[in-house]
Amino acid sequence: MKLTKTIGKEILLGSWFLGGGGGGLPEGGEAVLEQVLQTGEVVFRDVAELADDEVIVTASLVGSPASTTSCIKDVHYRQVYDWFCLNNQKPLSAVVTNEPGGHSVTNGWMLSAITGLPMLDAACNGRAHPTGVMGAMGLNAIPDYRSLQTAAGGDGPREIGITATGTVDGTSQMVRMAAVQAGGYVTVLRNPVTAAYFRENASVGVVSQARMIGQHWQQSMGDLPTLLQTLKALLNCTLLGEGRIRAIDLQMSGGFDVGTFTLETA
């Protein structure tokens, strides 16, 4: 599957739903999509096409999606890729986004457009998650697994780049600290795994699923009851409640978006 503007928007809408409240808004994803299409070509491959020993790397954006002081430049995508290749023992065959989300599903797209490395029709996790450990595909439970993470971001005096190796939790904490220093978030490559491990532990096919949801979403635009019925049929969902959001509280703390909302139901 080759990324186009139409396909990209379908993926963004579906990923916004699958993100489950995390992963940013489609507006942010659309800005990335436009930039990616102007930069190069992005092709999605099925992980089944890879040999068991080929290496997959995760692309992520770590930090606060609500930040207004963050800055990710094209050079940062190239830097994290070069640093990762310099420190990883095997060549990379594909890149995968860490999670669905209106913005986060685009993680890896710019890197793919710049380097030609294919994206996979998959994600580490089937929904958005706030910590690196949650999106580590169980690697944190493997005693001898050594995580490799490279991160870059920020502008002017806030610009920062790091390479970290160690446990999944330890390196993830280092990246989170870098996101705070960068003013909100950093672009990250992390946790190389074989295709064999990935097939058994990742959310394979979720990009195609997101696209399908996005197509139905567009067809039902403005007709909420029809959209809800379609989503329930597609995903075997249960509607827990419906009503107006009466209050929202959103704060940025330690590189996280932390918030609550109040839903008034009948």
Would you name each region that the model predicts?
Residues G21:
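Extended, polar beta-sheet/loop recognition surfaces of beta-rich domains
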